[in-house]
Amino acid sequence: MRVWIDADACPKMAKELVVKFALKRRFEVVLVAGQPQSKPALALVKLIVVPSGPDAADDYLVEHAVPGELVICSDIPLADRLVKKGVAALDPRGKEFDAQNMGERLATRNLFTDLREQGQVSGGPAPFGDREKQAFANALDRILTRLARQS
């Protein structure tokens, strides 16, 4: 099994949790980034730095992740592409992307993008705290268990 991480936008705490799970469950973690990042000095963790450019990391993830694997990402259009390919996708706050919720997630994203462009909404998501960490850990455990059963 392999877990991919869209590393540029993923909170450090979420990356660390994935590595802890990988050590216990023995799976590979692949960090994909548009810029160099630090990574744990563990054989089961790899870092792939893609050439800079719009959506380069996203395109790499869509091209290389396969059904039966999991991608951690907060990018909703990326998650949509992955779900359509049959790849499991989870955001760092513990919300799984799936075929049933993608339409709503995309519509909400597009609405907030429009509101931000009009100056009606500012800021981003709340800081990543203990509640988000616990929700992510629970969802990660649930999805990894499901994927292990399917393989």
UniProtKB/Swiss-Prot annotation:
Transmembrane segments: none annotated. Coiled coil: none annotated. This is UPF0178 protein Pfl01_5469. NCBIfam families: PRK00124.1. Belongs to the UPF0178 family. It comes from Pseudomonas fluorescens (strain Pf0-1). Pfam families: DUF188.
